[in-house]
Every structure is written in structure tokens, then in C-alpha cells.
Amino acid sequence: MYPQGRHPTPLQSGQPFKFSVLEICDRIKEEFQFLQAQYHSLKLECEKLASEKTEMQRHYVMAAPHQCPQGGTSYPHWPRLSPLQYYEMSYGLNIEMHKQAEIVKRLSAICAQMVPFLTQEHQQQVLQAVDRAKQVTVGELNSLLGQQNQLQPLSHAPPVPLTPRPAGLVGAGATGLLALSGALAAQAQLVAAVKEDRVGVDAEGSRVDRAASRSSSPSPPESLVEEDHPSSRGGSGKQQRAEDKDLSGPYDSEEDKSDYNLVVDEDQPSEPPSPVTTPCGKAPLCIPARRDLTDSPASLASSLGSPLPRSKDIALNDLPTGTPASRSCGTSPPQDSSTPGPSSASHLCQLAAQPAAPTDSIALRSPLTLSSPFTSSFSLGSHSTLNGDLSMPGSYVGLHLSPQVSSSVVYGRSPLQMAFESHPHLRGSSVSLPGIPVAKPAYSFHVSADGQMQPVPFPSDALVGTGIPRHARQLHTLAHGEVVCAVTISSSTQHVYTGGKGCVKVWDVGQPGSKTPVAQLDCLNRDNYIRSCKLLPDGQSLIVGGEASTLSIWDLAAPTPRIKAELTSSAPACYALAVSPDAKVCFSCCSDGNIVVWDLQNQAMVRQFQGHTDGASCIDISDYGTRLWTGGLDNTVRCWDLREGRQLQQHDFSSQIFSLGHCPNQDWLAVGMESSHVEVLHVRKPEKYQLRLHESCVLSLKFASCGRWFVSTGKDNLLNAWRTPYGASIFQSKESSSVLSCDISRNNKYIVTGSGDKKATVYEVVY
């Protein structure tokens, strides 16, 4: 028992023994010190054994197949545990159950993602099987627990990692938790693997792993900070703290997870072309202000993002909210301080260009792609495009799920890209995420007559068929030199017209190479912005309106373009123009809310449509020139009968109207709003679609002449192409600044956009 460490007695044969008190005392002292050290060592060993005994008791209880003694069934040698031990054991079980619930949710998401790949018949079978799998009775649960206990002897049951309870945690009842101990012990083998694969998922299942987002996004997020916020813990070793940190995660709630892992997809500018910046310092301006111009038609350069003039200075909160009958559903408040607000003639639109990125670095992204091990294994990776290609995201199929299934899975974009891959040879390999794929939230909703809103299940031919683009490719960048508030393209697609401050520039885009304007049409005053320009159908005349009471009509057929007529109204500014199909009549939306009808042959005012209580912002013609649609800052869209000269319809919204367009061959009206929503209304029935891909004001909107698709642009730098009417996203482009205006050529082969970074961009539409 004792080590052979005692000092030997220095006795030798033949030597007489001499008794000495001092020597005896020294020996006693040495023996005492030796015994004291040995006692201390044995005490430490005893404490260690006691600690191991307590730990074994905990594992013994966790692996016990029977209920707690309080439950009525006693175990032959049930260990007596302190309340603290039961408390910690309950906390560990609680963590384990949350982990298992998370695993179930992710597996359910995988099942829901797989359902669209099946035939309709197999989909029903799978959904029924999923429903049956969720109906587990108590008897089945007890049977499963018994089988697991037989397969796993207690001596080999792996321990469940226990963690010290965090401060303030309310302990769960041990009785109910211990009933699940057998099943939890059997599942404990998954702990290590799950901890490595664990990826935070928000309440809607819309967040993907940060590392993969940085890899798959066209540009890195501006700010992605991940911090750990451990709770107050009682110490029981570094390993337990690490496991607890891994299981509980750095977030206090699912909502916090979403907030901490937002991925901002913005391009990092290479060099600032202009010292002017937006008030907020980061978001590009939305559009030149279109507010009060009653004093003088001053510059558009003072109220960032205010799209229209106001006839009176009122705050956004004071605007009429509209009637409940036709109000848009789910609209959001203004995005930031640069959205339309009260203004005067002196601050009608300071358009500051966000520092522009090189054209070859503009982020062009497919909005509905998904990078994950799931998509990678099925060759469903996101597009990897070159030289400004806009990739078609693929087919997005809505899920028809039972309430049980749909409760655990958000409606999302199905990554069916295999059949519709536009550039398979350019596709980059998907980044393998260490987690479960999560679909983005639904972005298209159908609103019925009774106001019920449901995610839209897209048909299988949503992104295929005649007249549906596959993607778009950037062709030209036209350096206008000022913020481009108006663009139009000729019917021959030879010339593009860009309107900025005080002039319209004409560009020949028929030939490749660098572009310089072939003509400059000086209009209005030099400091006033052009807000709209329209070509007559014959392409021989151009009508220009903006921050002035005068419309200019240019003769483009002359050897040198010249003004051949001017039309003057009482309103201080014009913000939108439309020309009748027969080119005999022109309509102008005025800052005072009136719609002026002009006779182009006699160059005279014919009539005014009065109804908007605030500035009229946008306009379009339908029904072969017999109806006029207008939108305004009074939150209304109005329909006018041009033959009878009266208002036919009025649709009220809870957000200002910035843009609209009528489908050329169907009864659908698309409306772009300050709330960032695009709403597609049926003009003869009380139903509509609400589209939510924009992140800020929707500033312009244009239908293709075939009517099967349309585009919208916004303050969020995005150009979105949508399927009519349900809004399946065809492609998406992210420019370097707010996209203020757009136009589509008559043959639907080209798209032109004007932006806040003082340039216009020409895209080729590829079918």
C-alpha cells in the first residue's frame, strides 16, 4: 500500500547503537511529513473516485429504460440524485430534444424540396406517407423504446453530453423527460456529426450558411459578423462548455438568427465617379424628386428618391391610406429617408450616383438559385456567368402540400434548373454546405377577391415557351454624364435616347465598340432634368417633358434635329408621357395631378382629366388607345375613358404609385410602388398578384410588346424580369446604382435602363 520510500535506518553490524533524542525527533518529523503527503494524495484520489461515481450515476440514469420512481415503476438499484443533478440532466435532455426537433425540421424541408421532382401520382403517395409517418401513438413509442433497450445494453449506451445549466433556466420536470431517456441515449451517437453539420435556420427557413453565401454570391457581403453570446454557466470543464456552446448557438431566438445572418448582395465600387453621395451614405438614390414645383422648376437634385412632385408639403404619414376594398395587401413602410417625402421647388431631386463599379464587375445574379449539398448532388448549382450575362434561374414550382407538411416548410423557389439551364458549360460547381438546404421565402402571392393571400404555384411552363427570354446580356454602356431619368429606344433599335439634366443625348447602338452620342438635344433649362421622352411610332419625332411647364417636340428627320413645336401647360412640371397608337394625341402627367390631352396635329390642349389629388407619376394606354391608366402620389391608380372623357375605375393602395404598365394583349395592369412591391391587377376581376423581389421603391416598369413578360427597376439597383401575370422571375440584374428608367424595344430583343450613376445600359435579350 505504501511506497518503498522510507529512509533506511543507518545501522551497521558491529557498530554500537548510540541513542540520541535529536535524531529520534528528526526521524519522527520526517515520518510525519511523509505520512501527511501520502494522506493528501489519497484524499485527492478519493475525491476523484467520488466524482467519477457521480458521473457514472448520471449516465446510469440517462440510460435507464424504466420510468423514474415517482412514475410508479421502480428500478432495482435506482441511484439517489440531488435536485441539482436532476436539474442538469433535464437541461441536457431539453437540449437534445431541441436538436432532434431541428433535425426533423430539416429532413422535412428536404422532403418538401424533393416533392416537385416527382410525378403528380407519386407526389400524392409521398405526401400521404409523410402524413402517416407523423402520426406516432404512445403505444408505438413505448414499443420502440423497448426495442432500443434490448438492442443497446446499458453498459454500452453512449453518454449524452451534459452541460451546466445556464443562469435563469427553468428546469423541466424530470419525470416526463426520463421516459424518453432510452431513445435519446440511442440517438446520442449522432451528436458529434450533427454538431459539425449544424447550420442555423431562421423561423421561415430562409437563411443559408454564411460561408456558402460568401462563396456563391457575386460579391461578398458588406458585413457579416458572427459573435458568440454564451449564457452564464457553471463550470464543469472546457469540453462541456464547448459542447454547450455548439448546441445552444450564439442566438437567443430564431429571429435573432435571421438578423445575424442577413446577406447583403451589393457590389463594392472600384472608384467614385462623383463626390455627391446620398444622405444615408450607402444606398443609392432612387429617382429625382417629383415633388412641389409651384415656385419654380428647379433642379431634380435635392430630395433623393422622391419620385414625383407634390402640390403641397405634407409628410408621408399624412398621405391618404386608401379604402380597404382595393388596398394593396402587405405593403411595407418607406424604406429609408431617401424615399419620397415633402419637398419644395428647391429640392426636387438630388440624384447622387453611388460609386460605380466597372461594367465587367456588375453583379448579375439569378434570384432563385440555391447552393447546397442537395442541389450539388442533383446538378442544381447556381449559374456562373461571364461578362455580364444574366442567368435564367430555372423553373420555380410551387408546392401543393397538405397543412401538416406546409406547416413545416415555407413555400420557396424550387431549384429546377436542369431542364432550363441557359449556360450549362459555364456553370460553376456548387459550394458544398455543411447543412441542410433552405428555400428562400415565396415572392409571388395571389390575392383573391376576399383578400386571401396565398403563395403562387408556378406552372411547369412558367419559364419556357415562345416569347419567354432565357437570359439577357449586357451590350453597351452609354456614359451620359448626368443622372439618366428617361430612356427610350427606336423601333429600328438603331438609336437610344437618354434624358438627363437639360438635354437628351442620341446614341447609335447599331454597331459594336465604345459609344459616344451622335447628337445632343438641349431641352428646357440647363439645370432642369428631363423626366420623360417618347418617340412617335414613325420614329421621326421625339416628345420631351421634364421640370418645366413646356413640352418640346423635336423633328428628328431634319438634317440637324430641331424643335418644331412646344406645348405649354399651367403645371410647373411634367413627369410622364404617353402617345396614342395613331400618333395624333399625346398625354402628359403633371405635377398638379392633372392629365393633359394634347392634339399633336394642331399643337393644342384638348382637355384635362382631373381626379388625382397629388402629382401624377406614371401613365399607359390600353384597349387600342381607348383607355388611359394613370398612377399618382395620392396612392391611387385611375382608369379613364378617352372617348367619353370620364373616369371608369379607381384602385386605392396604401403606398404611393411610382410606375405602371398595361399588358398589350391581356387584361393585366402591373403597378410599381414605393413599398417595393409590384402588384399585377386584373382590370375586369377583383384579383391580383403581389410580387416581392424588389427591396426598395419600384421606379419604372415596362411590358414587352408580346405581353408575356415585363421588367421593373428600382432604387435597390435591380432590374427584374417577370412572367405575366403571376410573376415568376425570369432573370435579374444588379447594377451599381438606382435604376430610374427602362424601355424595351418593339421587337423585344433589347432592354435599355437609365441609372443614378450617370449612365445608361443596353441589354440584349436572349431567347
Swiss-Prot record:
Belongs to the WD repeat Groucho/TLE family. Residues 296-309 have a biased composition (Low complexity). Induction: Repressed during TNFSF11/RANKL-induced osteoclast differentiation. It comes from Mus musculus (Mouse). Ubiquitinated by XIAP/BIRC4. The modification Phosphothreonine is found at T278. One of its GO terms (cellular component) is nuclear body. WD repeat Groucho/TLE family members are characterized by 5 regions, a glutamine-rich Q domain, a glycine/proline-rich GP domain, a central CcN domain, containing a nuclear localization signal, and a serine/proline-rich SP domain. The most highly conserved are the N-terminal Q domain and the C-terminal WD-repeat domain. One of its GO terms (biological process) is negative regulation of canonical Wnt signaling pathway. Residues 198-212 have a biased composition (Basic and acidic residues). This is Transducin-like enhancer protein 2. The modification Phosphoserine is found at S253, S274, S306. It comes from the Eukaryota. GO terms for molecular function: transcription corepressor activity. Residues 280-447 are annotated as: SP domain. Keywords: Nucleus, Phosphoprotein, Repeat, Repressor, Transcription, Transcription regulation, Ubl conjugation, WD repeat, Wnt signaling pathway. WD repeats lie at residues 479-517, 525-564, 569-608, 611-650, 693-732, 734-766. A motif (Nuclear localization signal) lies at residues 238-242. Homooligomer and heterooligomer with other family members. Binds LEF1, TCF7, TCF7L1, TCF7L2, UTY, HES1 and HES5. Expressed in bone marrow-derived macrophages. Residues 1-152 are annotated as: Q domain. Residues 198-257, 264-283, 296-346 are annotated as: Disordered. InterPro entries: Groucho/TLE_N (IPR005617), Groucho_enhance (IPR009146), WD40/YVTN_repeat-like_dom_sf (IPR015943), WD40_repeat_CS (IPR019775), WD40_repeat_dom_sf (IPR036322), WD40_rpt (IPR001680). It is found in: Nucleus. Residues 153-215 are annotated as: GP domain.
